Amino acid sequence: MVSEGRVVRVNGPLVIADGMREAQMFEVVYVSDLKLVGEITRIEGDRAFIQVYESTDGVKPGDKVYRSGAPLSVELGPGLIGKIYDGLQRPLDSIAKVSNSPFVARGVSIPALDRQTKWHFVPKVKSGDKVGPGDIIGVVQETDLIEHRILIPPNVHGTLKELAREGDYTVEDVVAVVDMNGDEIPVKMYQKWPVRIPRPYKEKLEPVEPLLTGIRVLDTVFPIAKGGTAAIPGPFGSGKTVTLQSLAKWSAAKVVIYVGCGERGNEMTDELRSFPKLKDPWTGKPLLLRTILVANTSNMPVAARESSIYVGVTMAEYFRDQGYDVLLVADSTSRWAEALRDLGGRMEEMPAEEGFPSYLPSRLAEYYERAGRVIALGNPERYGSVTIASAVSPPGGDFTEPVTSNTLRFVRVFWPLDVSLAQARHYPAINWIQGFSAYVDLVAQWWHKNVDPNWKEMRDTMMKVLIREDELRQIVRLVGPESLAEKDKLVLEAAKLIKDAFLKQNAYDDIDAFSSPQKQVRIMRLIYIFYNQSQDLISKGVPLKKILDKVGPIEPEIIRIKYTIKNDELNKIDEIENKLKATFDSLLKEVS
């Protein structure tokens, strides 16, 4: 029998209970007769410090605390895709049906996976086979996009004694029995896993394949690889949420998990409304058929922000183990860090910089280190990845504050949003001077092999132009562009073309919202031709004004490509390219 404790003190979401000598760290407990879910975060003697994931209004000293004997865990199995959960993996749609209220009642307990729904199970092995951790024993077609693979749990191995025939089963039905050293272990279609423990894998690999997003600045300027980590810091109103929503909508991931952590509820509502209507550009099916939403909005309990991040990343690892590429989008980790600060203050811990706890960097590291591309456990051999992209909301856009500066230590892609770009209506407002990607050289090989062998050369030329333009900006402010050398005037003209034709992208335009890799390269090639050919002519003594008089009428056509030419109509770009080359050829003939 698991022992009970008693509440001795209540301080907001922190409850202190005694009589908890046998309790363990991170064990789930239920506080008072309301059965409020909490997690033990510190033990001193027989006292346990519990962070409660629901409102503690009405909880008083003397109330009972019931131990569960298990850590905070999630249910992993068929039925996850297309659902919206709260930070404790409680299905919000099921709660709405039961409670008949727009609010989540306290102490409500509904399993994450529907116990009534039947799934069509197709076995992939046979009785008598040797099985080990991660082996696929059968599959369930969960949605049109996702084939859910039923795995042997990581701690089970032995001989398959029984296996269910092909047919319809609920997640509670036993589909296999494994003889493990004489013990019969039942295997159901779902398994439970503690959220704070990373799921095991066979081998971690270097991320070499880009996670294509259809957003030009993210794919070409600062690319992210499958299994990579990225941060999007930016002040209020700079476009973090729209950029993250574009990532969730258009990225080439098989499964997308969107965690709304401490942000406005309207944003999650927007996702729920738009995802069923929008079509996945890679498959043509509704986006909700590959998406899981975890909503822990700003008006929900602060403590559950931490659990929502861990719930999301554990579900991501589960689909990675099935051999899928998963994208985890978290908006925003700053709200989670603020929850840590709040709880740290209530537990009277020594504060570090700006009041955040001293263990903030290690918590961020634990989270980002769960990303990666791996060879999954079990047979058949399969590759999966978890890519993490998180928003950071620094107060006043100060990138030196602790959450942003510590996040920078652990991510390999930095997409900083610049409020001055947002105010100038340049979206996505990613600052091309401050941003960086450590994956450029790794993903270049994929681009060269699958799209264009000159991809890196064109990208690097574009970046050099943008960096040089930034250096010239101060001079132009002081003395005007007329005093510049011809080649520097060309830099300003080329940079303007890069911004207007390539970097700016309208997330709400039907054609421009998603740009295929081929289309991105074709636009970049036109800019590359314009810059290189103009440079050659200037070196031969042709003034820039003369070049622009001839080429000027073609520039608006290059800028309009993103709005007017669809991803499957790239042959129309050939006409513009031929016209551009012919114009430069005629200029060259005039010089020679």
Curated annotation (Swiss-Prot):
Its Gene Ontology biological processes? proton motive force-driven plasma membrane ATP synthesis
Q: Cite the GO molecular-function annotations of the record.
A: ATP binding; ATP hydrolysis activity; proton-transporting ATP synthase activity, rotational mechanism; proton-transporting ATPase activity, rotational mechanism
Which reaction does this enzyme catalyse, per its entry?
ATP + H2O + 4 H(+)(in) = ADP + phosphate + 5 H(+)(out)
Instruction: Give the subcellular location.
Output: Cell membrane
What residues bind ATP, as annotated?
234-241
Any Pfam family hit: ATP-synt_ab_N
Cystines in this chain: none
Q: Among the entry's GO cellular component annotations, what is one? A: plasma membrane
Could you list this entry's UniProt keywords, alphabetically sorted: ATP synthesis, ATP-binding, Cell membrane, Hydrogen ion transport, Ion transport, Membrane, Nucleotide-binding, Translocase, Transport
Q: How does it sit in the membrane?
A: Peripheral membrane protein
Chief location bin: membrane
SUPFAM superfamilies registered for this protein in UniProt: C-terminal domain of alpha and beta subunits of F1 ATP synthase (SSF47917), N-terminal domain of alpha and beta subunits of F1 ATP synthase (SSF50615), P-loop containing nucleoside triphosphate hydrolases (SSF52540)
Describe the subunit structure: Has multiple subunits with at least A(3), B(3), C, D, E, F, H, I and proteolipid K(x).
PANTHER family, per database record: H(+)-TRANSPORTING TWO-SECTOR ATPASE, V-TYPE PROTON ATPASE CATALYTIC SUBUNIT A
The entry's family comment says:
Belongs to the ATPase alpha/beta chains family.
Q: HAMAP family from the xrefs?
A: ATP_synth_A_arch
* Function as written in the Swiss-Prot or TrEMBL entry: Component of the A-type ATP synthase that produces ATP from ADP in the presence of a proton gradient across the membrane. The A chain is the catalytic subunit.
Instruction: List the protein's name.
Output: A-type ATP synthase subunit A
